[in-house]
Amino acid sequence: MKIEIIKKNINFGGIVSDINITEDLNGDIINNLDNKLNELCLLVFKKQKLTDNQQIKFSEYFGKIEGAGNNTTIRSMKERRLSDKFGDVSNLDVNNKPLKKTDNKRFFALGNRLWHTDASFKKIPAKYSLLSGRKVAKIGGETQFVDMRAAYDALSEEKKSIIKNMISYHSLIYSRQKLGLDMKKMISAEEIKNFTPVKQPLVRENKITKRKALFLASHIGKIEGMEKPDAILFVNDLIEHSTQENFLYTHHWDEDDLVIWDNRQSMHRGLYFNDQNEIRDVRRTTTVSYTHLRAHETREDLVCRLLLE
């Protein structure tokens, strides 16, 4: 296995070669990949023709899969193409046809083109996301990633002091409001409860590397102790700072690419493609780490590892 660093100036991202992730992998390889994710935050695997079951198996090497629950989508179970272990970030309906231009599910999915961190709106947010390009757009549809560790490091000491104990509120309602969507008209009052805002720190520290990172997303709608307009502008300024070119990697998709990234240390967004005339079938699995026993790991090993994560 070889890893070529993508952005050497900030030690961000790596292209992994000489590995077939459709096969069984031993504990040493998984631990090496996990260590590289802590170090580089993002790994790209080329030419990995995965089935859904193979993607699930590979994902579970890194933690328990967080299912696509009612607080992640407005698609009902009967409207979903994929199992609930997947986040469907395609432009397709249950019949594998492009969602119509005026479909609320399409409008909701457009929120993925805003800068965000997966599942920051959950009490226990995501650790890793794994995105498999089953069919990709010929033009557009890239995914951009930014290194939130480097963005934090570049802040002034004064700004670091200001934000170190800040608490923000995350909800998909906040990000969709930025698109002009009125969720109260799209779903029922009972369903709205699934999107109750949750608190998150504005700065997180990786317990292994000890590096701090900004924890931002367009899902933020409030900051404790700030008036809402001030909070929105404050977050917008931080996002603008964090998405400078020197912190950014743009992934141009080839079919059968698999990209895995650390949501604790990065932020991302999808770019425009013609979703009425092209199919973009990308399937995401998302992991959390608090209940998973890795291959060749004892329960005592698990407890020790989780104390570090």
Which stretches of residues belong to each language-model region?
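Non-heme Fe(II) oxygenase catalytic core, chiefly the N-lobe of the double-stranded beta-helix
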Residues: 2-258, 263-290
